Amino acid sequence: MIGGLEHLARRGLFLFDPEAAHGLSITALKTGLVPSCAAPADPRLQQSVAGLAFPNPVGMAAGYDKNAEVPEALLKIGFGFTEIGTVTPRPQPGNDKPRLFRLIEDEAVINRLGFNNEGHGAALARLKACSREALIGVNIGANKDSADRIADYVTGIRTFYAVARYFTANISSPNTPGLRDLQARESLATLLSAVLAAREDEAGKCGRRVPVFLKIAPDLTEEGMDDIAAEVLAQGLDGLIVSNTTLARARLRDRKQASEVGGLSGKPLFEKSTAVLARMRRRVGPDLPIIGVGGVSSAETAAEKIRAGADLVQLYSCMVYEGPSLPGRIVRGLSALCDREKLASIREIRDSRVDYWTGMNV
């Protein structure tokens, strides 16, 4: 539960429009105004995923730290890893404002930001100043007006290869027209082939193989999930991130804001994204790493993602409502779960409810 000081801070931030509040939170992290809420290290929560050693399974999702301004500050407040971006080769302003909306009754957010970011150059300069030990992923995308979107992803791999601990190819944002078309089998095959070829080329140059994940939408058909699973396995991708925001608006209480165009995130996304996670786990088998995202607001929801097939989890929107102590509270809660269930590793619960979530009608 959110503490008294965080409650007051939230009330203050909610006096501002969402984008202004986001900027203030970045400034607070930059200036050290956010106290560390990190939980003690717990070996039962440590995970080896895609060749990387994660100190705990709770990460900051892409979208918060778009321009790599505060990755190390986020790690200090309790996240085991963080993901910057989405970054595009050239700076772009994104869509017209207003483009970010709070659904307070639902503890949700709708955004139609449109990959607003300062471009590769600005993010790269900041990441070069970070510790090489910091577990920072780079989420790469394509410029809205790009003549060759696949080339933009390849450029992202090459530009950030020396500083990224892992990459995420974001082809599932609903806010860049036509981007989700890259999830179609033929387009996906071309994209993954190009991205992985660039990765192998860069790995040969520097002697370090950086994992590549694919972030997918929660609004896929069964056939779409089949195609993605088949292509990911055929091409030898390192993992999936499930899922991005949804276009669905089922069971929302805030009907006024629900009519806004854009992707929905936060608590209402939990069931849908977790069901898609389980269905993808069923399709790809037990070995492919999956990061579960969508509606993670507590230790229990984080654990449920793991039970549904996730190796790691990420969050963002729920921290808007729960405050910066949320990652530390989740990590403490997962340690407590290990105590209660006498687990040697949190991994022991993985896949234990895949069948339940696969059958969930969402």
UniProtKB/Swiss-Prot annotation:
Compartmental location: Cell membrane
Main subcellular location: membrane
One Pfam match: DHO_dh
Positions bound to FMN: 62-66, 86, 139, 170, 215, 243, 266, 295, 316-317
An example Gene Ontology CC term for this record: plasma membrane
Metabolic or biological pathway: Pyrimidine metabolism; UMP biosynthesis via de novo pathway; orotate from (S)-dihydroorotate (quinone route): step 1/1
Mode of membrane association: Peripheral membrane protein
Keywords linked to the UniProt accession: Cell membrane, Flavoprotein, FMN, Membrane, Oxidoreductase, Pyrimidine biosynthesis
Note on how the cofactor is bound: Binds 1 FMN per subunit.
GO MF terms, alphabetically ordered: dihydroorotate dehydrogenase (quinone) activity
Cofactor(s) listed in the protein's UniProt record: FMN
Subunit structure as annotated in this protein's UniProt entry: Monomer.
Function: Catalyzes the conversion of dihydroorotate to orotate with quinone as electron acceptor.
Record-given protein name: Dihydroorotate dehydrogenase (quinone)
Lineage: Bacteria, Pseudomonadati, Pseudomonadota, Alphaproteobacteria, Hyphomicrobiales
